[in-house]
Amino acid sequence: MHFWWTAISAGLLCLPQALGRSDSPNYTVEELWKLETTFWDNFLYPANVEQMEAINSTLFTPDVQGRVDITRVFNGSELNTEYIFGLFSDPDHVSLVGVPVDYSIVQFIAQGNIASATTVVTFNATSFGNLLIPVTIDTWIMWDSNGQIVQYDATFRWFGFLLDTLVETLAASINGTTSEATAALTQLLATTICATHDQYCTGANQQYDNNTACYDFLTTAIPLGKDYELGRNTLLCREVHEHMVQYDPALHCPHIGPTGGDYCVDDQTYAQKVLQKYFNQSWIVGVPSTGDIWLGD
């Protein structure tokens, strides 16, 4: 009996290492809640401006990994700082949802160094008559022992419904049909992107021969895009990346150009997107993660 009890005890002592990452921090739920709210506090405007100006936000580890369902994956602190904070930091610039002004976490569960949450973020859609619109964002976030984000996975819930609502709002403002509003949105986004291209994408970074060529391509050669196509060869994808051009023209000008760079391209099937091996660490907590198909090679 003593032998079996000793063996069982030894097994239990080894269990945490067998079931998870022994070097991962073990935060309390209260600490994880604080880390979660710290992120969202800094996501709001104008706090996000300060994060953006830092170039590499200290909320992220240098090699942070991020994935957003409607766009793509983002690697490194500089790129994530630009897309997470810079994308929503200018209320005077044309954009789909404008700037985030408030949030409410409505679902939250956490263990170890991982938190899963649903957050309703109120955006001021300044390009749509200062429409205050709630956007539901589901997130999984993992932190290191310094409280920095190691990796995250974000999903915009009901994003198609959101896009339809924005188009309907625009239709009402111009007293037009949905089709007319869609055409007006296409023209507005294309005009904005081409103006940004003319200002920042010069010399070796130039993507279009002139403004007319830019506008014609964006309005006739590619579709506006569906709700899941902000990371494909669409106008909506280029709208996302247009905001980043000012920060690093050499990197981002190709994203708004005809080739789409590495981001606005149709290089994935549905199955390839779903089965993409990406994350360095498993999101599975408390049980063996053998066979996790999302882990990178």
Curated annotation (Swiss-Prot):
Leader sequence segment: 1-20
Annotated transmembrane regions: none
Carbohydrate attachment residues: 26, 56, 75, 124, 175, 210, 280
Keyword Glycoprotein listed: yes
Alphabetically ordered keywords of this record: Glycoprotein, Signal
Keyword Glycoprotein attached: yes
Function: Part of the gene cluster that mediates the biosynthesis of bifonsecin B, a dimeric gamma-naphthopyrone. The first step in the biosynthesis of bifonsecin B is the production of gamma-naphthopyrone precursor YWA1 by the non-reducing polyketide synthase albA, via condensation of one acetyl-CoA starter unit with 6 malonyl-CoA units.
Family under the similarity heading: Belongs to the bfoA family.
Protein name: Bifonsecin B biosynthesis cluster protein A
Origin species: Aspergillus brasiliensis (strain CBS 101740 / IMI 381727 / IBT 21946)
